[in-house]
Amino acid sequence: QFDQETMTLHHDKHHATYVANANAALEKHPEIGENLEELLANVESIPADIRQALINNGGGHLNHALFWELLSPEKTEVTKEVASAIDQAFGSFDAFKEQFAAAATGRFGSGWAWLVVTKEGSLEITSTANQDTPISEGKKPILAL
């Protein structure tokens, strides 16, 4: 459970700043478009003068946007399909929770723990520093903390 102060800080300050800074960077190169997922999936395609700004701020926006999308005021159940995929990848839901918690608590400093779908279609737990996104590694994030 999260407290209101933490959520307000992350939504109204951090996320809003990432959006503003990503937009400011994109304005310098309108020719590259505005699809952050496509751009961050191929960071070398981003002009050098705005690359790090988009990695940091575009990643921050995408990471937070997924996080907000996943939040719910009520408890939700894992679908049978997802539960089966988790059991196959990690052995059990309890093992998944342990590994995911370890990824989250093992990150020194700021960053994210992720459940991702790899290019091969399997589930994987990973962690990224700061506002780096697994999209840049060719992975599709489906759970973020």
Swiss-Prot record:
Q: Does the keyword Metal-binding apply?
A: yes
Q: Which cofactor does it need?
A: Mn(2+); Fe(3+)
Q: Which family does it belong to?
A: Belongs to the iron/manganese superoxide dismutase family.
InterPro entries this protein is in? Mn/Fe_SOD (IPR001189), Mn/Fe_SOD_C (IPR019832), Mn/Fe_SOD_N (IPR019831), Mn/Fe_SOD_N_sf (IPR036324), SOD_C_sf (IPR036314)
The protein's GO terms of the molecular function aspect are: metal ion binding; superoxide dismutase activity
Give the reaction(s) catalysed.
2 superoxide + 2 H(+) = H2O2 + O2
EC number(s) recorded for this UniProt protein: 1.15.1.1
Q: What role does this protein play?
A: Destroys superoxide anion radicals which are normally produced within the cells and which are toxic to biological systems. Catalyzes the dismutation of superoxide anion radicals into O2 and H2O2 by successive reduction and oxidation of the transition metal ion at the active site.
Name one matching Pfam family. Sod_Fe_N
Q: Which GO terms describe its cellular component?
A: cytoplasm
Query: What's the protein here called?
Result: Superoxide dismutase [Mn/Fe]
Q: Which of this chain's residues are annotated to bind Mn(2+)?
A: H10, H64
Q: Where does Fe(3+) bind?
A: H10, H64
Task: Tell me how the cofactor is bound.
Answer: Binds 1 Mn(2+) or Fe(3+) ion per subunit.
Keyword annotations for this protein, in alphabetical order, are:
Iron, Manganese, Metal-binding, Oxidoreductase
* UniProt xrefs under SUPFAM superfamilies: Fe,Mn superoxide dismutase (SOD), C-terminal domain, Fe,Mn superoxide dismutase (SOD), N-terminal domain
